């Protein structure tokens, strides 16, 4: 049931991108996503694609593995494409019954598809090359200025990392409860949606109870190990920028500058 | 190391609206002393108050009456809580609910991080603690991939990394298979013998208790019996009256003795029984 979830999966290998400071990767992903919305021509998307391809090369993650992750959004992609294809007004190219495909619609839906695919691949590249722990560390460090406005940054990061730690444990537990219910005649296979929803209740109640019990135990175990919030805490793996991280930031600035230029130069041969 | 004087702990019962409706006396007038470096076992059936007692040693619960001193520190003093928790580490029953890190080494580093130990020193402590429990080669693994016994040894390493004087283990082997159980107890024994760390082991496996220096048997919130393993396990009927078993060998020897064989009481191991039987001939 939960085998298909590939969200935030980490691909273990050694590469330049894996070793990069996670803060650079988060900032880089944000810059990359913004750049996808800055450029609006096919040439612009080509630049983004080149950048992405270079990053994939640096990541040592097999291209097939990344593309396979795209299957999850295939339906979403097809729906957005068809809506844009058929519903954009403009110069009619083909007419099938009451449906019409316009020139503008065709271009727009193509751009949309490219943009969406690049966006998903780009952001999944970040999670593929960064462990969840590094991600939470980086988020804590990047959000640090917000502490001045009394945002509990450390607590948020700690919550995220504990949540990630408990995902596999709770999944295992769900599986166990499900098997126990099936052994007593529960029906989880029903195709009927309402029946399916109803069968989830006896699954969720014990799951929630056990999750609360675990939370209680964990809180006590953390207190027993002197946890008292972020104040006065040291780090086992502090984040320190190195030469390659600075180089990466420079590269990002250059990349973004190119994207902005492409948008505002409005060269006549670009569509 | 630990001194408990006339300790009483009441749990407050609440009705459905959350109003206090009565109290349950979980610990009733307990006094005991633990010398530094001892290996102590606490036995007792479910609900005898042994977990409640354990939580007092770590300032997770506070006395209703009486007092607990850990290495001379009074647990009633709120300012000393963190020193006490550092002095007396705690290992709980369920390994999954006490491992915080997603990588073994990060979990072991959690305690020292909380104490504000400098980064380089944390790495030293993590290395030495993982080596002490024989889990060093698993340091980069995810805790989810380890067996129960391995997870529990990681939990122990997480406590050792805080350099405690005493480790309280609250049924650390209850959820483990026999080989995991042996690994955990051996790790605890090694720490006790080689590092001189005081160990307080709460268990209901009698085989684990026979290696202790001293045993406390709890019943209904009171210390019902105390003494060396040999003293405790030679009182077979008393133990059975408290719904506790004695080791199988001890029981066998006891039954043989009742049937008229001349062997001593309080036999704890198979070797001792064999020797006694051969000596009798």
Name each model feature, range by range:
Chain A
Residues 69-73, 77, 113, 117, ...:
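Loop-to-transmembrane-helix entry motif
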Residues 51-61, 76-79:
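Alpha-helical transmembrane segments and their membrane-interface exit regions
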Residues 14, 37, 60-65, 96, ...:
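Membrane-helix interfacial "entry" motifs
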Residues 41, 45, 60-64, 88-96, ...:
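Transmembrane helix-loop junctions in multipass membrane proteins, especially transporters and channels
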């Amino acid at each position: 049931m939960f085998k298909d979830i590939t969200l935030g999966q980490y691909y273990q290998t050694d590469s330049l991108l894996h070793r990069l400071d996670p803060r650079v990767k988060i900032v880089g992903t944000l810059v990359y996503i913004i750049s996808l919305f800055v450029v609006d021509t096919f040439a612009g998307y080509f630049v983004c694609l080149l950048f992405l391809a270079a990053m994939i090369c640096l990541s040592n993650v097999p291209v097939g593995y990344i593309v396979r992750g795209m299957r999850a959004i295939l339906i979403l992609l097809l729906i957005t494409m068809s809506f844009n294809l058929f519903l954009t007004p403009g110069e009619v190219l083909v007419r099938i019954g009451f449906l019409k495909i316009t020139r503008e619609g065709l271009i727009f839906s193509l751009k949309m598809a490219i943009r969406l695919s690049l966006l998903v691949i780009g952001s999944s590249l970040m999670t593929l090359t960064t462990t969840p722990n590094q991600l939470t560390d980086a988020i804590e460090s990047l959000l640090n200025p917000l502490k001045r406005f009394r945002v509990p940054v450390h607590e948020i990061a700690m919550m995220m990392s504990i949540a990630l730690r408990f995902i596999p444990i709770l999944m295992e537990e769900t599986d166990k409860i499900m098997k126990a219910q099936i052994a007593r005649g529960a029906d989880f296979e029903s195709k009927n949606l309402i029946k399916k929803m109803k069968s989830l209740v006896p699954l969720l109640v014990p799951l929630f109870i056990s999750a609360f019990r675990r939370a209680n135990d964990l809180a006590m175990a953390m207190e027993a190990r002197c946890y008292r919030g972020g104040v006065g805490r040291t780090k086992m793996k502090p984040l320190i920028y190195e030469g390659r991280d600075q180089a990466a930031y420079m590269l990002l600035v250059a990349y973004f500058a190119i994207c902005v230029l492409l948008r505002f130069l409005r060269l006549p041969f670009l569509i | 190391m630990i001194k408990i004087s006339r300790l009483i702990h009441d749990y407050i019962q609440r009705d459905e609206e959350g109003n206090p409706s009565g109290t349950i006396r979980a610990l009733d007038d307990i006094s005991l002393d633990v010398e530094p470096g001892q290996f102590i076992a606490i036995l007792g059936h479910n609900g005898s108050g042994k977990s409640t007692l354990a939580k007092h040693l770590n300032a997770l619960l506070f006395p209703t009456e009486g007092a607990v001193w850990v290495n001379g520190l009074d647990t009633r003093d709120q300012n000393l809580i963190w020193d006490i928790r550092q002095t007396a580490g705690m290992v709980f029953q369920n390994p999954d609910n006490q491992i915080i890190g997603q990588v073994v080494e990060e979990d072991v580093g959690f305690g020292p991080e909380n104490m504000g130990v400098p980064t380089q020193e944390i790495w030293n402590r993590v290395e030495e603690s993982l080596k002490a429990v024989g889990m060093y080669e698993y340091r980069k693994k995810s805790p989810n991939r380890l067996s129960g016994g391995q997870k529990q040894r990681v939990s122990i390493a997480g406590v050792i990394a805080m350099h405690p004087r005493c480790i309280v283990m609250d049924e650390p082997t209850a959820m483990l298979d026999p080989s995991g159980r042996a690994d955990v107890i051996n790790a605890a024994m090694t720490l006790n013998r080689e590092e001189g760390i005081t160990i307080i082991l709460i268990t209901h496996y009698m085989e684990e208790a026979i290696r202790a220096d001293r045993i406390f048997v709890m019943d209904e919130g009171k210390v019902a019996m105390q003494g060396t393993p040999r003293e405790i396990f030679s009182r077979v009927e008393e133990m059975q009256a408290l719904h506790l078993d004695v080791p199988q060998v001890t029981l066998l020897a006891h039954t043989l003795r009742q049937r008229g064989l001349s062997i001593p009481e309080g036999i704890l191991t198979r070797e001792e029984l064999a020797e006694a039987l051969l000596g009798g001939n």
